[in-house]
Amino acid sequence: MTSIGSQAERFQGNDRVLFGIILGVITFWLFAQTTLNIAPDMGRDLGLGASTMNTAVAITALFSGIFIVVIGGLADRVGRVRIVRIGFYLSIVGSLLVGVAPVGRWASSFLLTGRALQGLSGACIMPASLALVKTYWDGAARQRAVSLWSIGSWGGSGVSALFGGLVTQSLGWRYIFFASIVVALLGLMLMRGTPESRASNQATYHFDFAGVITFMVAMVALQIVVTQGNKLGWTSLPVLALTAVALVTGALFFRIEARTSAAFVDFSLFSNSTYTGATLSNFLLNAVTGTMIVSLELVQLGGKMTAKQAGMLTLGYAVAIISFIRVGEKLLQRFGPRKPMVWGCLITGLAILLLSPANLLLTDYRILAIIGYTLYGTGLAFYATPSTDAALSNLPEGQAGAGSGIYKMASSLGAAFGVAISAAIFTAISSGTDSARWMEGVITFYGRQDNLAVRTAAMIALMFNVFMVAVAILSIMLTIPRGKKSQ
């Protein structure tokens, strides 16, 4: 204990360790997230149906979101470097299972197990690596480290659709996951020699089994309701039963966490308004990831574009978020977190509005989409570092892992439920033959008239995302203080 503590006190974070951490982050946000774009190719090659592939896509974010706080708290006690390494090992095994998934009856077992392990990998790497950034970097160096860490997460997510499509077309989708193994091994090598870091208060650790189980059941039930409600029927017995399960177990979860001293979600962290605002707005800004699935489905189903052509529209998003994420850091240093977070949300909202006019001709819409996706990346870049720094800098030292775990849980669950809800709205409206009639005389639709249901569905689903941006702005203005934090 003493040797570990003295080594950690003397150690200063360097670029070798930081690059190793970033490689771990992109194994989840870049490589694992490519399934959002390549799922049809994977399903076709493996002989799996759409429902199985939808589960395979969703299970990674779901497992990450469910376990990220538990593992973040565990990292504070057993060692953050150790948990990051475990995350690398899980990523390697998970990617290997997906990459070698056989055709036939074992395909779904290999695929779903591998995707679940990738989610657990993200749950290990994200909170523990953020806690290491908080521990081994300070001041401006920490803000730079957070910016580069954010490039791995936000930037990796932005590039994933384009990257997945290009690799699948050139080499085949399996090579995405083989490459992920190589990246994970390199990350492990770069982090060799990093001293262990633990919370200073080494109290006896008690696993919050009841809290974890009730939270997991509530989240899984809610996810099934959102994703399958339209197919099963919103008033069907299974959907109503699952809704009841989600409500009951959710209430039990809050009751258990409020009464136990070993709660895996420490609600006392939310007594700090800055941390609360950063986490809530982070959930909402990740939830507008639903914008991408709706707008890309719109141009493919309504405009008959190919997946590759649709993916190329997002190129500006990837370039902007990587190019401007350091700008968010500079804005943070000059103005504090509040202004750049609000500016980022406003730009993101404008981007979604530009993606919304599905009544235009496809040639006109493509121009707006290119501009919109570029602004989308710019807005998220402005927001990312100020929000992450606001959350990290307001965490007590002994709760760095658990607190950063809650913050990143907001990312995973926000994206999971944002995509699910947006897709559910889009699917429900676009599948109805008479769904567009109520807009006749209100909005003029140019060009083809056989796709009005799809175009109407996209406009309504995208307006839902604009609403979430508005709520994010409100939460920031109510919770994040003006100006820079005093040093």
Predicted regions: what they are:
Residues 1-30, 44:
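Cytosolic juxtamembrane N-terminal segment immediately preceding the first transmembrane helix
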Residues 18-28, 35-37, 237-242, 249, ...:
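12-transmembrane solute porter fold
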Residues 38-67, 106-112, 308-312:
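Extracellular/periplasmic helix-loop-helix junction of adjacent transmembrane segments
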Residues 39, 156-168, 222, 226, ...:
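Small-residue (Gly/Pro/Ala) motifs that create kinks and tight helix-helix packing interfaces
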Residues 76-210:
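Helix-loop-helix hairpins in multi-pass membrane proteins, especially solute transporters
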Residues 169-282, 288, 313, 466:
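Hydrophobic transmembrane-helix bundles of small-molecule transporters
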